[in-house]
Amino acid sequence: LLNPPEGMTPIGSPFAMMYFLDALEKEGRGEEIVQAIYRDYQPMLDEGATTVWETFARGTTGRDGFPTRSHTHAWSSAPVRFLPRVVLGVTPEAPGGTAFRVSPRLCGLEWAKGALATPGGPVSVSWKRAGDRVDITASAPRGVMLHFKRNASLEGLDVHLNGIPQR
């Protein structure tokens, strides 16, 4: 799947993206996750979508040449799982949403901003890269701990979390 043989049928449905993106994440291939999401979901946005569709916007599977049958399908929402975990780097460290790791992977991006819903409220993270410096702003509800952890995409960079330099 990560290195498909020539002639292999490509993923044709957003339903399979969950498994594909999961495999990429396990292999530490965050940049490819972002590329796959952009490749397969950007065409929906280009058509004015505000939800995720049942099928990718390739070809004409619906009537009147419109590229889908249904405009809202939970099975198509894999990016909602992976973007906070990979690009924002927010992952749980303790049961009940009481502690989270913040370890954003840059994935070839210059900035990212978002939040992860938790039982106590949102964990929000934004980051911006400027040259060799990465500024991360993170916040969590009262009683929720955040722990920063470096990853390979941050190696050699001057990282600041909420204005404090990180080693």
Q: Can you say where each PLM-predicted feature lies in the sequence?
A:
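Solvent-exposed loop and edge beta-strand segments that line ligand/cofactor-binding
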Residues: L1-M17, R63-W75
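Well-ordered alpha-helical segments within folded domains of soluble proteins
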Residues: G12-K26, W75-R85
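Non-catalytic C-terminal accessory modules of carbohydrate-active enzymes
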Residues: E31-R167
